[in-house]
Structure formats: structure tokens, C-alpha cells
Regions:
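Active-site core of glycosidic bond-cleaving carbohydrate-active enzymes
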Residues: 1-205
């Protein structure tokens, strides 16, 4: 079908999009670090098959599908809406696939993935950002406002108003006393995004 197993090669486990995305994320990271196009050439067919598999899994969207869950920002003191995360991950998958297709000279596929990324990004910002305050919200419209939601939005590039999202990340970090309110996915990028937003002292604290 194209789905990647959470445990390879034996199969099993669980995780969904937040684990399966590693197939795309890691291939691009290896290419960026070493510049070896053969990495992308070797794994592109599998990544393309995975993206085809994801087409009917309900993203972008706000309906929970077991095929794309169940894991989010695991072990975080503050829970971030799963659908907010899953849609953000899907955006980054599409965005990276457009870059990978471009690097491989597959122009038509590059444009297809670019269009998908634009569609997901529009949906994410309309669904998970409150228009008045610019704070993040859950799929049901209630307030989310977690460090992870802002850090992911910045790191993955899904936020349209990066300045406003960055300000909320800094505000939230200060509001919880410069403690870590993130889990598996938010922690590694938290200080990076604070620093990127010019809040170096906040990151140190």
C-alpha cells in the first residue's frame, strides 16, 4: 500500500504519520548534509508510494483516522491537539517531497507536491490559528496555546504569520517560567525556534 512500518523490517508497533514521516525527513536531511543525490534517487519511489497511500487518509482535515495516529507530542506536560500536529506533519511531508522532486528534475511531480503543500498550509492556518489573537487552537476551535504548537508551526514552515507565531512562542515560554512544556516533537526544536525569533536569553533560561 505504501505505508511504512513503525518497526522495520519485522513490522508492528504504532505511531502513524509522526513516525512514518521519518522516511521523507531523513532522506532530505541526508541529502542536505552530504549532497549525495543518490540517496534521493534510491528512496524516492518508496516515498512517492507513501504519499499516494496518504491521499485518502483525511488530511488536510479534522477527522480522526486511526491510520494517521495515534501519537502526538508524547510525554509533554501540556498536550497539543493531535490534528494540529498531524496536519503540520503532512504539510512538511508535501513540502519536502516538492523539494526532493525538484532536486531530481521531476518538475511535474514537484508542482503537484507544491500544490498539495499550499493546500495543507492554507487549511492549517484557517483551522488552527485564531484570527483575532493569532494563538493556536484545537480542531474544535478551543484554545491550544502550547509551546509545541508554536515551535512546530515555525520549524515546519506551516505558519503563515511567522512573526506573530514567534511572539506567542516567546510569550508562552515566559508565561510558564521558562520551563519545558513540550514532548517528543516539540522539545528538540524549542530552543532553536526561540533563538530564531531573537529570544536567545529566553532559550538560555
Amino acid at each position: 500500500e505504501g505505508q511504512y512500518p513503525e518497526i522495520a523490517p519485522v513490522g508492528g508497533g504504532f505511531g502513524g504519520i509522526t513516525y512514518e514521516c521519518a522516511s521523507i525527513f531523513m532522506a532530505w536531511e541526508l541529502y542536505e548534509q552530504y549532497g549525495d543525490i543518490r540517496t534521493l534517487e534510491k528512496f524516492y519511489p518508496g516515498m512517492q508510494k507513501y504519499m499516494d497511500y496518504m491521499k485518502d487518509k483525511g488530511l488536510p482535515g479534522t477527522k480522526v483516522n486511526p491510520a494517521i495516529g495515534p501519537l502526538g507530542d508524547w510525554l509533554a506536560p501540556e498536550e497539543t491537539d493531535l490534528l494540529l500536529l498531524w496536519n503540520a506533519f503532512y504539510y512538511k511531508e508535501a513540502d519536502l517531497m516538492s523539494r526532493i522532486a525538484g532536486a531530481l528534475g521531476r518538475t511535474e511531480e514537484q508542482h503537484q507536491y507544491e500544490a498539495l503543500a499550499a493546500k495543507v498550509k492554507k487549511f492549517w492556518n484557517e483551522t488552527f490559528v485564531l484570527p483575532d489573537s493569532g494563538k493556536t487552537c484545537n480542531a474544535d476551535g478551543t484554545l491550544c496555546d502550547t509551546q509545541c504548537s508554536y515551535a512546530i508551526a515555525l520549524s515546519y514552515g506551516v505558519a503563515e504569520d511567522r512573526k506573530r507565531i514567534g511572539e506567542h512562542l516567546i510569550r508562552k515560554t515566559r508565561a510558564i517560567g521558562h520551563t519545558v512544556g513540550t514532548g517528543f516533537f516539540g522539545t528538540g526544536i524549542l530552543n532553536q525556534m526561540l533563538t530564531e525569533q531573537g529570544a536567545v536569553e529566553d532559550a538560555w533560561k
